[in-house]
């Protein structure tokens, strides 16, 4: 058994900072439960002082999660730290993660504080955090561009104040692996009391090296890695949890560490986060992409058929892909459906959700002869979103399209409990459907992105549509899936409108 590597997931905090990736409290709870099943050690549930909505979500997650540590971020000031402390109070295990910038450019231009003032603020924040919990993490923002002597000083002081985990973020994704490993080795050696705490890496992907730098930090002595599902995060994203976990698992000979993550829950977690945030996973994404275990070359196919390990360093099943791609049919019953969901790592929160998902499955089975695992993931995720959000819900859609004539869309949907009818022409069937919705709603939102992804192969495949809308500075992603791509598009548009409505409700409650 090697050293323990702690996996700190920040999908719900740093990941949510991706444009349009905002989540409701219920969605955050659902993802937190999946992260707990995955076996992550620490779930950073949000930034308690940022908004009442964030505080409520952290508090609810702290009440729900029993096995993982629930953490809140806090700037190094009393208001933030106390908000974090109150938010995590119900947690079986709670952590406060406080931070302040330490690079010369950040201290001078952003904080306008002297190094001594920064040290004092950090020490005070850690001491206040210890009033709430014995588990306190301190981060030196922009650490990889900070003076190492100053870092050793501030880290030494916060250790004396009670910090138990020290995080060294590459905030702007500037680091390179060789220097990262050396930096960690030197910093740990030079920090007074550095052998008494857990050292952590938090790397961003601006130069495409977040995972490589995180692994280099492990070689340099880090025993916690901060990461997100699918590498989600602002700008180019964060270190990808699935890549970090499988790298240390597959190359234990190099890294000599073990995590407690259940790798078979990786794909279910990836699919859930993708659906909730509206961020599709690129097909060639390591571990969780649709092509991650596909072999096109004849030579590769021949080798894999003879012995899988000729071209596969891990099995698809080991990370949660199902070995049996073809699943249920129209004659399958509710128990078979429930059993298959369990095999796929899909857990529904209630009998109501299971019944609704099974009804949707039966509808899909009437349209599609072969139903694959990917269909079930899309169907169940879509149903969970529908149960939660009833402000806008599609009832029916009819589109008439004739060569040389503009398509005409007639739509019926529920708006705030009332059935609405809309009709419009457009430059194409999707445009007509969107305009028919807007004729009724008049949201004033701008369409920023429209993308379509085939969930499985063949002409019967469900199409998964992502729609990104923006309004008054807010950006949201909506998703919809159906065998009819126009219907999927309408679902995605209404899903995005629902997210805008949820954000407005949360803002109104915060202002009240």
UniProtKB/Swiss-Prot annotation:
Cofactor(s) recorded in Swiss-Prot or TrEMBL: Mn(2+)
Chief location bin: cytoplasm
Pfam families: HCS_D2, HMGL-like, LeuA_dimer
Any one annotated GO CC term: cytosol
Highest taxon in the source lineage: Bacteria
The protein's Enzyme Commission number: 2.3.3.13
Gene3D superfamilies listed in its UniProt record: 1.10.238.260, 3.30.160.270, Aldolase class I
Alphabetized UniProt keyword annotations: Amino-acid biosynthesis, Branched-chain amino acid biosynthesis, Cytoplasm, Leucine biosynthesis, Manganese, Metal-binding, Transferase
SUPFAM superfamilies listed in its UniProt record: 2-isopropylmalate synthase LeuA, allosteric (dimerisation) domain, Aldolase
Keyword Transit peptide (UniProt): no
Annotated metabolic or biological route of this protein: Amino-acid biosynthesis; L-leucine biosynthesis; L-leucine from 3-methyl-2-oxobutanoate: step 1/4
Gene Ontology terms, MF aspect: 2-isopropylmalate synthase activity; acetyl-CoA C-acetyltransferase activity; manganese ion binding
Subunit structure: Homodimer.
HAMAP family with a match to the protein in the record: LeuA_type1
Protein name in the entry: 2-isopropylmalate synthase
